[in-house]
């Protein structure tokens, strides 16, 4: 696996993006709200900074992890993802709609996981 998609830019989605980016994976994070995406990237940057300050992560690795995260509002961004992790709000109707819109954009061999 090289590319991971994350649906939802809340606490869980940003955490998943953080861990995957530090692990060396390219991350595509999608949310319906640009503001949520901006907050998520700022949170990841803050948390990576804390890891760096504590000596848990080199500064070069922090910058590299941040560079691996891209954001957007269109599910088409997941077209080349090997795995897409759904971390949207805990509402069954929302989740059904997410999957309905997501599936047409995925490769036939892509995996889908839900949080």
Question: Could you say what each language-model-derived stretch is?
Answer:
Residues 7, 15, 30, 72, ...:
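Structural motif
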Residues 35-36, 50-112:
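Rossmann-like NAD(P)-binding element
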Residues 1-50, 54:
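NAD(P)+-binding Rossmann beta1-loop-alpha1 motif at the extreme N-terminus of oxidoreductases
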């Amino acid at each position: 696996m090289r590319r991971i998609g994350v649906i939802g830019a809340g606490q869980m989605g940003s955490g998943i993006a953080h861990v995957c980016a530090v692990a060396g994976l390219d991350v595509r994070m999608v949310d319906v709200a640009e503001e949520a995406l901006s907050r998520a990237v700022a949170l990841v940057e803050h948390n990576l900074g804390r890891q760096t300050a504590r000596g848990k992560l080199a500064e070069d690795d922090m910058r590299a992890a941040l560079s691996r995260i891209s954001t957007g509002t269109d599910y088409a961004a997941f077209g080349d993802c090997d795995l897409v992790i759904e971390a949207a709000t805990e509402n069954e109707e929302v989740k059904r709609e997410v999957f309905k819109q997501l599936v047409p954009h995925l490769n036939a061999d892509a995996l889908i996981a839900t949080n």
